[in-house]
């Protein structure tokens, strides 16, 4: 099984309830596609290194998952691209210990 770390940034002008719904939705997508969620971190609101879509800040979230296929990460990326609430994301495959 492969381990992935996914970091995504939610737009800063979102209401708290809507932010929670976005986080639950995208974390649920990862869990529903046959992956195991190892860890979830909410880094809170942080300043961006550069402006993205006229935003200078964003809510950072990090999720670590373990999966044996790419369905979870592919579906996450597909939906994150079309979501107005996520302004940036990155999916990183962690090295396997040998």
From Swiss-Prot:
The keyword RNA-binding applies. Pfam families: Ribosomal_S6. One of its GO terms (cellular component) is ribonucleoprotein complex. One of its GO terms (molecular function) is small ribosomal subunit rRNA binding. One of its GO terms (biological process) is translation. Keywords: Ribonucleoprotein, Ribosomal protein, RNA-binding, rRNA-binding. The keyword Ribonucleoprotein applies. PANTHER family: MITOCHONDRIAL 28S RIBOSOMAL PROTEIN S6 (PTHR21011), SMALL RIBOSOMAL SUBUNIT PROTEIN BS6M (PTHR21011:SF1). Binds together with bS18 to 16S ribosomal RNA. Belongs to the bacterial ribosomal protein bS6 family. This is Small ribosomal subunit protein bS6. The lineage of its organism: Bacteria, Bacillati, Bacillota, Bacilli, Bacillales.
């Amino acid at each position: 099984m492969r381990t992935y770390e996914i970091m995504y940034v939610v737009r800063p002008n979102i209401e708290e309830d809507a932010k929670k719904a976005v986080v639950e939705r995208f974390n649920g997508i990862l869990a529903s596609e046959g992956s195991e969620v190892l860890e979830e971190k909410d880094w809170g609101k942080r300043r961006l290194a550069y402006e993205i879509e006229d935003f200078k800040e964003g809510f950072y979230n990090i999720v670590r998952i373990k999966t044996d296929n790419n369905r979870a990460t592919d579906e996450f990326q597909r939906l994150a691209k079309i979501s107005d609430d996520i302004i940036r994301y990155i999916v990183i495959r962690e090295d396997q210990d040998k």
